[in-house]
Amino acid sequence: MSLDALQQRLGYRFSKPELLQQALTHRSHSAMHNERLEFLGDSILNCAVADMLYGMFGKLDEGDLSRVRANLVKQQALYEIAQMLQLPDALRLGEGELKSGGFRRPSILADALEAIFGAVFLDGGFDAARTLIRKLYIPILEQVDPRTLGKDAKTLLQEYLQGHKIALPLYTVVATHGAAHNQQFEVECSIPKLEIRVSGSGASRRAAEQSAAKLALDEAHRLVPQLVKRSRAERTGKTRKQATPPDPQLSLRLKE
């Protein structure tokens, strides 16, 4: 992808395009890499997201706001935004990193996105960087349920199952589709005790697992209450059976 095409996707045009080029450059490619820009962008991202959360979630306390922010700026969240921007097609990697599939690596893509935020800050100032971050994050924030503190589907599924003493789900890659630079993964999520078996897809194994986990969580929310109700009924039946006193007339008849 050309720098011009990426700038169109970002909705921001650099006065110094070399900053964007540096933000896309991995240390395996050249000495003028993106690690310092990533350091800068990380701080700007945290500040901008904190500002948005402060304005959107007035009822959350400091601890909950911090937890929501942590979930929104972690590697997986950044990776998914990078995929949406098609950053894998714009990265500058060394030959070895390119051959090993570095353009798909979540850490490399997340770092490049943070470096872009740093580059925009140096090029246009904090307001420009904040505007870009808001543009990318508002659609995500609109879907955040403050009750779950922005946790991803895999985390929510794990916590829900642990809360009901059900074994954790199993994730299995069942298929991959497409060329090496544009693969789609299909992952199956299974929960044997609930007889749940669902599949999700995504541009990475992690994204596909998240997709499958969301479907499994929906199914678990539907099935677990039924399982709990059935289990309680069985326990109640056993208790009543044990509490029923023996019939003395029946005992006499059996002796005769």
From Swiss-Prot:
Keywords: Cytoplasm, Endonuclease, Hydrolase, Magnesium, Metal-binding, mRNA processing, Nuclease, RNA-binding, rRNA processing, rRNA-binding, tRNA processing. Its EC number is 3.1.26.3. CDD domains: DSRM_RNAse_III_family (cd10845), RIBOc (cd00593). Residues 3-125 form the RNase III domain. Residues 226-256 are annotated as: Disordered. Coiled coil: none annotated. Mg(2+) binds at residues 38, 111, 114. One of its GO terms (biological process) is regulation of gene expression. It comes from the Bacteria. One of its GO terms (molecular function) is double-stranded RNA binding. SMART domains: DSRM, RIBOc. The active site is at 42, 114. Pfam families: dsrm, Ribonucleas_3_3. It catalyses: Endonucleolytic cleavage to 5'-phosphomonoester. Belongs to the ribonuclease III family. Digests double-stranded RNA. Involved in the processing of primary rRNA transcript to yield the immediate precursors to the large and small rRNAs (23S and 16S). Processes some mRNAs, and tRNAs when they are encoded in the rRNA operon. Processes pre-crRNA and tracrRNA of type II CRISPR loci if present in the organism. This is Ribonuclease 3. It comes from Ralstonia pickettii (strain 12J). The gene is rnc.
